[in-house]
Amino acid sequence: MGHKIFVSYKYADSDVRRITNNWYTTDTVRTYVDKLEEYISKVSEHIYKGETDGEDLSSLSEDAIWNKLKDRIYDSTLTIVIISKGMRNRYLRDRDQWIPWEISYSLKEVSRKNISGNMVTSSSNAMLAIILPDRNGSYEYFTYNKSCCSNPCRYLKTDFLFEIMRKNMFNIKSVDSKMCNDGSTVYFGDSSYISSVKWDDFIKEPETYIDKAYDIQSKIEKYNVYKELD
């Protein structure tokens, strides 16, 4: 069964690995979103609810753009957040940037009237973060593998993220974890409401990760989900 998918991302971030053969243009996060949109719209049964490349929003005010985005998020059931090296402007507050608001709205239960005049409340969206490689092809600005324990584990630099993303990772109520040899904590199972995956892994089997996001959503009561911006 197809799902309605919204994608949240930093449009013009160009610190990404090149994936096109057109050397006269610069690949950006939007280049990856185009690939994702193509899969959602043409290969899968899903419906793409995000912004389309070439869509002219220049004549609209910020309020009008935000209302359009809210309409699309409200009508979606999964929000994919694209993690890229330049996604966050550290000189601006999180609440002055688009992505945190899109995440917050995705997680809230929002009530609206339908065409019959009845109030309909949306559920918190399933969430999935896709990590893009930087221009050097590396993911280590956010994640890398550690081998300090008997079993290799994956390290996430959550301080790199917007606060609302950081709070919704490693936020399971009943924690299954152990102390690693270097003093860090290793988590087992689906410990985060916003799970994350590298682009190269996602694109090989996207449905596996989409299904996992919905599986986690079905157990949302097991997580401390943060929906507001500080």
What are these regions (language model features)?
Residues 4, 11-17, 133-230:
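C-terminal interaction surface of TIR/SEFIR-family domains
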Residues 14-27, 89-99, 140-147:
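Short, flexible/disordered intra-domain loops and linkers
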Residues 86-112:
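Conserved TIR/SEFIR loop-to-helix hotspot centered on a Trp-containing motif
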Residues 79-85:
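Short, compact, well-ordered microdomains
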Residues 1-78, 198-230:
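Conserved N-terminal substructure of TIR/SEFIR domains
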Residues 85-86, 110-114, 118-138:
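Short beta-alpha junction loops
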Residues 61-70, 103-118:
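Short secondary-structure capping micro-motifs at structural edges
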